[in-house]
Amino acid sequence: MITPYDSGGLLLSYKCNSRCRHCLYGCSPRWRKWLSITDAHKIIDGLRRVSDVSGRGIHLAGGEPFLDFPRLLAIQRIAVEHCVRVAYVETNAGWCVDEDDTREKFELLKDAGLDAVLISSSPYHAEFIPVKRVVMAIKVALEVFGPEGVLIWVSKFLRQLVSIDTQEVILFDRYVKTVGMSEARHSINTAYQLIGGGRAGANLGEFFHKSPPEAFFDNNCQMELFRSGHAHFDPWGHLIPSMCAGISLGDARDLPKLVKELDITKMPVVQTLAEEGMVGLYRLARRDFDYEPEPDGYMDKCHLCVSIRKHIAQRTRKFKELAPVEYYEQI
């Protein structure tokens, strides 16, 4: 049922030095759990056995993976040991306060086989991280990895933020006021490729056209759940299909077994999304859990989906696929 993966991401933790208003994974400083070294071995080996990630590779992310640098470095080495390419490590550069320390960490990762880093820059991150740290991280990364080894996500936002303030954090309202509502709406709609899952729909919906639930009733979610070729793996070992944070298809610490024996009849939410799509999940939530649609509507089907799933998760824990349960407390 699951199309073999050609790429994937390991979430070393949901723990982050920020609590960004757009975050798909509900990351914040409140999370505690980290992916164990043992489980990293199992997941990466499983990916190698059931997928072909030799081309696009995997990425290491969070949360903020540099908050536990020894673990990050160890997992980079594990990937090399299993002949699985790490395409890049993601970072928000919040930890980059000392240039020598930043260079040392980047050099250790490069020596361990890492080819690239992805450095985030956006008005969501800038509420927590001064732009000067991002600028310094980019400078050092270019020296260590070269221009082909530095991905800036997103350059347009970085240019805007540098023109506002590099020394202090930039509150979101200040960003919008400075660039103007029209430009802010255009940039937020086009620059970051946001989807409405996680916190984005609830916190940034005013910048998007919204529609009633019925607008998202046409299609099922089989592509996202089973056929995207991409997945994420969190510190509990949950297999997160595509970008569907808060949904687990099972325990990825034995990925060959999971892929072979996947039984969605034991996961009613997943089965409903796969067979009926949003219309089925919406009717289930209305019928069994008194879900009321949000009066202003939804920016996309992922916004509707996570709104319903959060409502259900707050009322029952009988759906094991709504995991980790802490996710629904953090978004």
Each language-model region and where it sits:
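Short, solvent-exposed loop/turn segments at secondary-structure junctions
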Residues: 17, 65, 124, 157-159, ...
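Conserved AdoMet/S-adenosylmethionine-binding subsite of the radical SAM
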Residues: 67-228
